[in-house]
Amino acid sequence: MLPPKHLSATKPKKSWAPNLYELDSDLTKEPDVIIGEGPTDSEFFHQRFRNLIYVEFVGPRKTLIKLRNLCLDWLQPETRTKEEIIELLVLEQYLTIIPEKLKPWVRAKKPENCEKLVTLLENYKEMYQPEDDNNSDVTSDDDMTRNRRESSPPHSVHSFSDRDWDRRGRSRDMEPRDRWSHTRNPRSRMPPRDLSLPVVAKTSFEMDREDDRDSRAYESRSQDAESYQNVVDLAEDRKPHNTIQDNMENYRKLLSLVQLAEDDGHSHMTQGHSSRSKRSAYPSTSRGLKTMPEAKKSTHRRGICEDESSHGVIMEKFIKDVSRSSKSGRARESSDRSQRFPRMSDDNWKDISLNKRESVIQQRVYEGNAFRGGFRFNSTLVSRKRVLERKRRYHFDTDGKGSIHDQKGCPRKKPFECGSEMRKAMSVSSLSSLSSPSFTESQPIDFGAMPYVCDECGRSFSVISEFVEHQIMHTRENLYEYGESFIHSVAVSEVQKSQVGGKRFECKDCGETFNKSAALAEHRKIHARGYLVECKNQECEEAFMPSPTFSELQKIYGKDKFYECRVCKETFLHSSALIEHQKIHFGDDKDNEREHERERERERGETFRPSPALNEFQKMYGKEKMYECKVCGETFLHSSSLKEHQKIHTRGNPFENKGKVCEETFIPGQSLKRRQKTYNKEKLCDFTDGRDAFMQSSELSEHQKIHSRKNLFEGRGYEKSVIHSGPFTESQKSHTITRPLESDEDEKAFTISSNPYENQKIPTKENVYEAKSYERSVIHSLASVEAQKSHSVAGPSKPKVMAESTIQSFDAINHQRVRAGGNTSEGREYSRSVIHSLVASKPPRSHNGNELVESNEKGESSIYISDLNDKRQKIPARENPCEGGSKNRNYEDSVIQSVFRAKPQKSVPGEGSGEFKKDGEFSVPSSNVREYQKARAKKKYIEHRSNETSVIHSLPFGEQTFRPRGMLYECQECGECFAHSSDLTEHQKIHDREKPSGSRNYEWSVIRSLAPTDPQTSYAQEQYAKEQARNKCKDFRQFFATSEDLNTNQKIYDQEKSHGEESQGENTDGEETHSEETHGQETIEDPVIQGSDMEDPQKDDPDDKIYECEDCGLGFVDLTDLTDHQKVHSRKCLVDSREYTHSVIHTHSISEYQRDYTGEQLYECPKCGESFIHSSFLFEHQRIHEQDQLYSMKGCDDGFIALLPMKPRRNRAAERNPALAGSAIRCLLCGQGFIHSSALNEHMRLHREDDLLEQSQMAEEAIIPGLALTEFQRSQTEERLFECAVCGESFVNPAELADHVTVHKNEPYEYGSSYTHTSFLTEPLKGAIPFYECKDCGKSFIHSTVLTKHKELHLEEEEEDEAAAAAAAAAQEVEANVHVPQVVLRIQGLNVEAAEPEVEAAEPEVEAAEPEVEAAEPNGEAEGPDGEAAEPIGEAGQPNGEAEQPNGDADEPDGAGIEDPEERAEEPEGKAEEPEGDADEPDGVGIEDPEEGEDQEIQVEEPYYDCHECTETFTSSTAFSEHLKTHASMIIFEPANAFGECSGYIERASTSTGGANQADEKYFKCDVCGQLFNDRLSLARHQNTHTG
């Protein structure tokens, strides 16, 4: 019968027991979450009810309660109110699930209801089990095992256990394993595993003890029946107001006492199900039980297979958990029992007290000793001592740690071992995680019977719980056979981590097991590699990851993203594991591969290195060092290391590495990486000139370009080693500078096509070398990242006798019509005209850089088509030598740069194509070719010849659409196509970086990596220069020819106005413009044909212009280089002597000159023959020769830089005034050249400090000019973050910047990167800084360095004057000795006091120039007073005589008084005679006086008045005061102790009393214009006009 209804009123205080029906209601609310079987919960609970497994140690009563609860869920008594039906169904089911050994006996008893059946079973248990610790285990094991098999999770916490239990089928306990017929649960992903317990064997085992329990069975039966009847009676006493609800509540309350505890213990083990994990609570904690250690909890609460049918195991695990807490569990159980039937009378309780006490004792025993005990034996049969002994012997660590002692120090039993190694491990892990020691200890040692035998491996077990765990292990093994995996919740993962040696994951191939899925995954790699080895095609990319493992990974870690190896398709959870794995594919045979590759390269006569993308890929996957220094052969893993290394060679001699191979390295782009990924597949593509095979036409075109470069250098013994990369067109162009070869057979046109598949006629070797002695014409098409289709635009180029010019395009769809316009200059001729297709700042949407080059005569055309795909690179003008020169120099290069338009227009053929031949060929002049080649062999220096300029016209092209093969994603900015959207995304970032600055050079070279900043010209080209350069056209002979729209034409029109006398004719129509230069304009050196951007006409880069020097006609791409070059002409001493008959045009960007540096030294010094990679180097070098002549006396020949700075600096001064943008700044003291004024300032600080040192030490110190530059260069290698606003120099930290800023405080000008020593002509002073005046001649200077230079001239003059004066003094010495003494005595007696002021007025200047002379003079002056009275007077008169000399004799130069003290120090008598010859007797007397002073020198001990300024001594205060006034007048124009001033000899004392008398012969000359002035003030005013 059902329990009484009123019991629910006694249970509300059990807060720890949740409402089970409510929990089950949750299950009904979300049935799919838990069972996945649809909305029919009734059927679900029916299956749970039928499949509940009986677990012996749970006890029959608890099993009954569970069955009743499941039946309620199944039959739903709220709709079916027949309690009898429920009771009968429960009884029927109960009889079905009881152990087989008990069925005959129970059926013989014929129980009428469930209560009687329970009584029978309880009596049976008591008869055959001891009362001590092990009392309830054996029977409970059998019963509970079956209960588990037949239960399924109906309610909240126990939902999982019950549901899982019922999966194994209802009849597993009654039928043999092979006859189980229950259907597989829809949620189950594994086959219906047979985990039933061979209870028949156990029946015999328990029947041996049945007699011992008979005595208690009947009594217990009667008491239980009576107690249950009382419960029923109490239930009937309740009001029938809501019978169904009350019944359900009663069942829930009853179940909550026991069933909840069972379910709580393991419901959290199925954490994969959210509803169960939410409802589950740790019962031992919630009910006040002693909490067991977390490690032990995890071991038995985890590792349950999702589809495991042995649900009874879950109940076993919780019972073990509960039984751990001994005393609290007992107390709780007793209180639960008392609360379970609270309304029973005391008599009833006493009546059933024996039974209840026994069950409580049994409950306490298995609760307290479940982990340490086995079977429950009656104390009459087995002593406690024996039980404890069994505990010690059979207990083992549930954590799987292998410890040999439990918490109380008892020795522990090792886990059972299964047949195979895998099963051993699985058994250990299973037993440790899912079983408790009670199962392993449950068999007494003295029992020989092993009733439970495993059908899989034949192992026998005496304890059913161990047998259950063992079968679960087999279940897990079978999971792998069907490709299923466990639900690896966090708890399961922790179990696996905590188990040592417990291996659960088995390899299908070899059967090896692992305790972690990651270990299994790593193990599978071995098989995967073996599979790959067996594959014939090593490139096979077939996935080899077995699906079970892959799904296992997903289920274990719950991730959707894995790292997959592209070679073998193996997946990894971490990128680091993938990297390690990929080393296997690429690391083993790397040496052999490299050696084999080099052998192949040597066979075909060139070193062909893969592109940097492949290098990066190889580096990523363990390749050896891929960056090799071609100077010393050292290899590096990173390009940055190579760059740093190559600086060592560069610092030693930046010009000794000429001819070295290019080692330019790049950071590969994504598209290139994708292309390089297929590079190794070696998809063949024929090439006419080489023996190489290429995967794509782009590779072929790349290789063809390399062949062109190779052939260009064959005649000179160069063999090019190129790290070629599609996107990096800058590098390619840098190595395609066509050099004429000295051998005749090599001097042929060489034409390259970018795609062999197109209709463009690719010249064969015969065609290429058919031409005669002329320099080859290289049409270099920079390959795109992906294969581009190209074809001839203007028709096939037929090789002619003169030259061959092949036009090629990247367009694969539209033939473009190209037209050429010619600019011819009759006075000159360019044998070389290079068209550079310059990418616009905003990449054009059309990528058809087809340009035609045509030379009228003596010219050769070369077309450089920029990389149409790499729009981010601004391709600057390369030094492309052009033959021809002006009358005073050889200028070979006509750089024609074409900027693509953003919206190109179709070019209309017909107009302005006078030079274009009918057959699409170009006429290439043949004269002077041999001479040009000779000159080119000498690196760009050509003899004077008539100039005939070949004008190339960049035409607008039709709208292009790129659809290369395999390209699907097109860039809207530039039209480049990509096979992958990710590549397009990466590519579009390039345009984003371009927009702020117009264009950016992303170029990496051996010297440095250029940061993505505004591309500078050689040193400092800036925005202002870009805007104002067009206004300077007249000065710099700049010419433009554009092919753009009206805006561009208007710009050309403005230029035409500014160049009227130079007659730059421009024919502009809507779509094309032809620039025609009139013949006869010999000054027109460099026609710069500039295709500007239609959308952004304001972004004309000065890099597209060529500036011409008016003095020599030399052309420069860089305005700063022209400014720097013009300073050479400003040196008068070099104008006539220097043979500047050679000219160079150098690239305008750092990246260009870097490429030059990496192997192509094109600039040669005509004096010494030294070659340079950059024209700026040549300029600097030429200054050495100039300085050799100018500063030969000082031997200063340091004048060129060894390295360029790491980063180009912003030239703010050039932005303000481009005319002042000097490429180098010179130190006027030592001639040292600098790139930035900050370096010059730092260098000048050394000079200033040295000047102070000279003043203090009285000696000149040698200055090493290169120290500052070396330090500057070293500092440039560091990353600069803080920039100086004055000069643009950057510093690593703000402290250095603060120190640097102080340098500019004392500077008269705003020193910028382009400041030169002549900048004061146009730039105003920063502030009112005093002029520096020369004491010798009175000239004023703005800067102390100029004054220092000026004083050096005085020193030379003084030396000459001293030599002449010494000769004159020797002749007059005799006469001076006769006349001077008498005159001196007379003068001393009369003019002592009057002469002192004037004497002292002259002496300060003397002493300022020569302090050492005056150091001796005071002694002579002061000696007189202590000796004879007349002598001091005479001595005082002597200076007076000197001072009066200018007054008395106006013809006497003022410098006479200056030189006299020095001569007196050397030869007093001689010096005395020198002035006497030109002066009167008083003057001579004054000169003679020092000699007499020296005679009385020993009589003076100390002076009366000592001047601290000049250390002069005076005998009277009046003379001393007058002397001080002189010092005050001397510092009007000269700041005291000014840096950079040097003491020198004063020949003319401008402030002396004789200054006015000397005015006629005294002048002041302006250093700028040479104008003379009578006084310094006029000179200062005049100089202000120069400075503004």
Curated annotation (Swiss-Prot):
Q: Where is this region: 3 X 7 AA repeat of P-E-V-E-A-A-E?
A: 1397-1417
Domain SCAN box spans what residues? 46-128
Keyword Metal-binding found: yes
Q: In which tissues is it expressed?
A: Brain, glial cells, astrocytes, embryo, placenta, testis, ovary and uterus. In the placenta it is found in the layer of villous cytotrophoblast cells while in the ovary it is found in the cells of the ovarian stroma including the thecal layers around the follicles. Expression is highly repressed in glioma cell lines.
Keywords from the UniProt entry: Apoptosis, Cytoplasm, Metal-binding, Nucleus, Repeat, Zinc, Zinc-finger
**Which PANTHER family does the record match to this protein?**
IP01015P-RELATED
Q: What does this protein do?
A: Induces apoptosis in cooperation with SIAH1A. Acts as a mediator between p53/TP53 and BAX in a neuronal death pathway that is activated by DNA damage. Acts synergistically with TRAF2 and inhibits TNF induced apoptosis through activation of NF-kappa-B. Possesses a tumor suppressing activity in glioma cells.
Query: Mind telling me what this protein is named?
Result: Paternally-expressed gene 3 protein
Organism encoding this protein: Homo sapiens (Human)
In the UniProt record, the gene name given for this protein reads: PEG3
